[in-house]
A protein has these predicted regions:
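Glycine-rich phosphate/pyrophosphate-handling loop used in enzymes and phosphotransfer proteins
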Residues: 1-228
Length: 228
């Protein structure tokens, strides 16, 4: 077989579980080894893996802001950011290799179920700007949300801005006004979970959470594939 990440050839080892689930292994041993699942202890707010269960530096900064203390309940992520996930994210996010998303379906569902206990949550993928969506042809956050198996709504509209990756960290951390909202009735008094590919400083998630809370959401949490 050919590994879907490194594209190297390998001999697959089938198990009764993989046969019954019709979920054959499509990753080589080396790539599996470098998939770094986030394990406790973690930051209780953003889910970053660390040596203790106290708030990390970024989350401490968010808690100091009066407009952010009650906006986001928590974030949880599946994998830590490393060289392998950098390559995966690039292929998935920028080259449209959406088949990679299916590789993570089992882990995504397991971590989501373990992290969120509310009944009938609404998933809201972080949107792309119209320009970015036209350029890529798909929104990776919508694809990730579809793996979870809960209702999906798309009431947020991204306002075109310069790329987050080109901004300094303090500029990203304190940015506002990235989104507008439509169709607010569907989220009033609902538990909302934002879905995105990666959580970095939290600026994108917090800004989306703020506007959803202002529109009447009961609570807002977030779930990402990767925590950097």
């Amino acid at each position: 077989m050919i590994c879907l990440i490194c594209e190297g050839h390998f001999v697959a080892s089938f198990t009764w579980k993989s046969l019954l689930l019709l979920n054959d292994d499509r990753l080589c041993i080396a790539c599996k080894h470098h998939l770094e699942k986030i394990q406790r202890p973690i930051c209780p707010a953003c889910g970053r893996a660390q040596s203790n269960d106290q708030l990390c530096q970024d989350c401490s900064m968010w808690k100091e802001r009066p407009d952010s203390t009650t906006v986001l309940v928590k974030n949880r992520s599946v994998y830590a950011y490393n060289d392998l996930m950098k390559d995966v994210l690039s292929r998935f996010k920028f080259r449209g290799d959406t088949a990679l998303a299916e590789l993570f379906k089992q882990d995504v569902r397991a971590v989501f179920k373990r992290s969120f206990s509310m009944k009938e949550p609404v998933l809201i993928p972080i949107p792309l700007s119209k320009e970015r969506l036209k350029e890529r042809g798909f929104n990776q956050s919508v694809i990730l949300a579809s793996l979870i198996g809960e209702p999906i709504l798309q009431p947020l509209v991204k306002i075109h801005q310069s790329k987050q990756s080109k901004k300094k960290k303090n500029e990203r951390l304190y940015q506002k006004g990235m989104f507008q909202i439509k169709q607010t009735d569907a989220i009033v008094q609902r538990d909302v979970i934002l879905i995105d590919d990666i959580y970095t400083t939290g600026a994108t998630i917090y800004d989306a959470a703020r506007i959803l809370k202002e529109a009447g959401a009961k609570s807002v949490s977030s779930f990402t594939l990767i925590r950097s």
